[in-house]
């Protein structure tokens, strides 16, 4: 039988930094934030992460007005008012001390934000280049893809994930609101949650 402390640690709400490549993908990030709103995890970001995702989205989608991007950031801040973290000088110095390339120094703020927030996870994509730096910084922080993070959450916070999925599906703007269409949407490139979609397919009666 599990001791209460062990059970509580398994079900504790984790903090996860959402990196700019994740926030740039609006469909994906909105799905993740529905899970967060349902209590599956607490999101973390920083002013610099906001600057990066808005800049990247302007480059990828120049037709989107700058005012719309400002509104999106304001909506994120209103929905999660304690998510924005200012990286401490000590954390920044610790990370930068182990950076040897310009790419590492450019991304150092993401790890410094995670350290300052005491986050357990950084959710990013394959562009994240601090694996070697992280091996030298003695902190237990995982770097996961959005799909891997959702799979972890399904294992640890199943009820909250399913509640978040229900809320996302209810708010989903897709024309066909069937469960099959929604799961196909998760698998499609704009979300890219193929393993998560496969796993959620077994919970379709709860979605």
Where are these regions (language model features)?
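Metal-dependent nucleic-acid phosphoesterase active-site entry motif
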Residues: 1-30
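PIN/NYN-family metal-dependent endoribonuclease catalytic core
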Residues: 15, 26-63
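Acidic, metal-coordinating catalytic cores used for nucleic-acid/nucleotide bond scission
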Residues: 22, 92-106, 127-131
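Amphipathic coiled-coil/heptad-repeat helices and related helical stalk/stem segments
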Residues: 28, 106-107
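Glycine/small-residue-rich phosphate/adenosyl-binding loop
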Residues: 67-77
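Acidic catalytic patch
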Residues: 76-100
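Acidic, metal-binding active-site segment of PIN/NYN-like and related structure-specific nucleases
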Residues: 107-142
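Acidic, PIN/NYN-like endoribonuclease modules and their adjacent C-terminal/linker elements
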Residues: 128-207
């Amino acid at each position: 039988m599990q001791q209460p402390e062990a059970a509580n640690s398994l079900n504790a709400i984790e903090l996860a930094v959402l990196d700019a490549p994740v926030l740039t993908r609006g469909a994906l990030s909105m799905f993740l934030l529905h899970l967060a709103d349902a209590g599956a995890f607490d999101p973390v970001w920083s002013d610099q992460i906001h600057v990066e995702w808005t800049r990247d989205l302007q480059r990828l989608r120049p037709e989107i007005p700058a005012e719309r991007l400002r509104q999106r950031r304001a909506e994120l801040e209103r929905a999660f008012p304690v998510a924005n973290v200012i990286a401490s000088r000590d954390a920044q110095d610790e990370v930068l001390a182990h950076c040897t390339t310009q790419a590492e120094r450019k991304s150092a703020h993401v790890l410094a934000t995670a350290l300052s927030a005491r986050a357990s996870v950084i959710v990013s994509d394959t562009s994240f280049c601090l694996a070697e730096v992280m091996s030298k910084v003695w902190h237990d922080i995982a770097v996961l893809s959005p799909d891997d993070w959702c799979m972890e959450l399904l294992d640890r916070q199943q009820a909250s994930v399913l509640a978040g999925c229900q809320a996302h599906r209810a708010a989903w703007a897709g024309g066909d609101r069937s469960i099959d269409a929604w799961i196909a949407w998760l698998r499609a490139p704009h979300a890219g949650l193929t393993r998560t979609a496969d796993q959620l397919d077994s919970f379709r009666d709860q979605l």
